Amino acid sequence: MTTTYVKKFDGNTAALGRTLVLFGGTSSEREVSLRSGAAVLQALQAGGVDAHGLDVQADAIAKIEAFAPDRVFIALHGPGGEDGKMQAVLDWLAIPYTGSDHAASALAMDKLKTKQVWQSVGLVTPEYASLVENSDWQAVLDSLGGQGFVKPAHEGSSIGMSVVSTAQELKAAYEKAAHYDAKVLVERRIVGREFTVAVLNGVALPAIGLKTDHVFYDYDAKYVSNTTQYLCPCGLTQEKEAELQSIAQQAFAAVGCKGWGRVDFMQDEAGNFYLLEVNTVPGMTDHSLVPMAARQSGIEFNELVLEILAQTLV
């Protein structure tokens, strides 16, 4: 397992040519993406890259073709930008781009399919059930130990998520999640500590521990609250952090991801780790976790952005 990051970008910004940063879009994560894109664009321009931004709307493909960039930095979050669709368009246009390819992006965006892949290779993820309009709410909840997390299968940033402990709450949570996605799942609730591990160019960066006074690490805790605590160093022993980083790399590879991303975990009270999801285009805002982990590895934000973009030179 590799956990010591060696910078790969040689500083030759001329080799990057004209770069287009894609952000915004039309998903429920648009506001976060606008912030990520603005930060990335500013960092690239500060680093001497000929970088330009595009808020992705209905005419985005024509605008990308007209601009004819040498490479693209994808800072789109959620459906339409993180789910393989934009990646497939860029493949068709033969334009190099940051992050995972269209197949891995589509798989990682689907929490149900991702969990199935992880289970098939022996990686541990919380027990779960798919929900439909006429599910037996009590039976589902009983099968998961009486408490669950309800999630839209294709949303990020904890959008549409709920914690439930009664059949009535489960039904209401399903209806809330179904507003965002036709595919909804409920996971067994793991009580314990939450961690995340960023992966950059095959290297697992230092883990981050998350503490919030909310019921769970929801949208407000991620992007608005000033009371959320980010622990880096994460508070685990060296051995347990190494175990967590190893699982993150295995989970990342199992889905076929490459370049950069982030893997989220829960740790139960017995010390066992459970995989929650993988993010192929993590946030790059002032509250974001990948820049925090990179900083712990001696990589400042502007350097991190260049390291991610330099993946397109390979």
UniProtKB/Swiss-Prot annotation:
Cellular component annotations (GO), alphabetically ordered: cytosol
Record pathway: Cell wall biogenesis; peptidoglycan biosynthesis
Biological processes annotated in GO: cell wall organization; peptidoglycan biosynthetic process; regulation of cell shape
List of residues binding Mg(2+) 1: 264, 277
Note on how the cofactor is bound: Binds 2 magnesium or manganese ions per subunit.
Listed PROSITE patterns: ATP_GRASP, DALA_DALA_LIGASE_1, DALA_DALA_LIGASE_2
Enzyme class: ligase
Gene Ontology MF term list: ATP binding; D-alanine-D-alanine ligase activity; metal ion binding
Binding site for ATP: 141-196
One Pfam family matching this protein: Dala_Dala_lig_C
Subcellular localization(s) per the UniProt record: Cytoplasm
Gene3D superfamilies: 3.40.50.20, ATP-grasp fold, A domain (3.30.1490.20), ATP-grasp fold, B domain (3.30.470.20)
UniProt keyword terms in alphabetical order: ATP-binding, Cell shape, Cell wall biogenesis/degradation, Cytoplasm, Ligase, Magnesium, Manganese, Metal-binding, Nucleotide-binding, Peptidoglycan synthesis
Cofactor names: Mg(2+); Mn(2+)
Keyword set includes Lipoprotein: no
UniProt feature coiled coil, ranges: none
Binding locations of Mg(2+) 2: 277, 279
PANTHER family xrefs: D-ALANINE--D-ALANINE LIGASE, D-ALANINE--D-ALANINE LIGASE B
Cited HAMAP family: Dala_Dala_lig (MF_00047)
Function: Cell wall formation.
Protein name (record): D-alanine--D-alanine ligase
Organism from which the protein derives: Saccharophagus degradans (strain 2-40 / ATCC 43961 / DSM 17024)
Gene: ddl
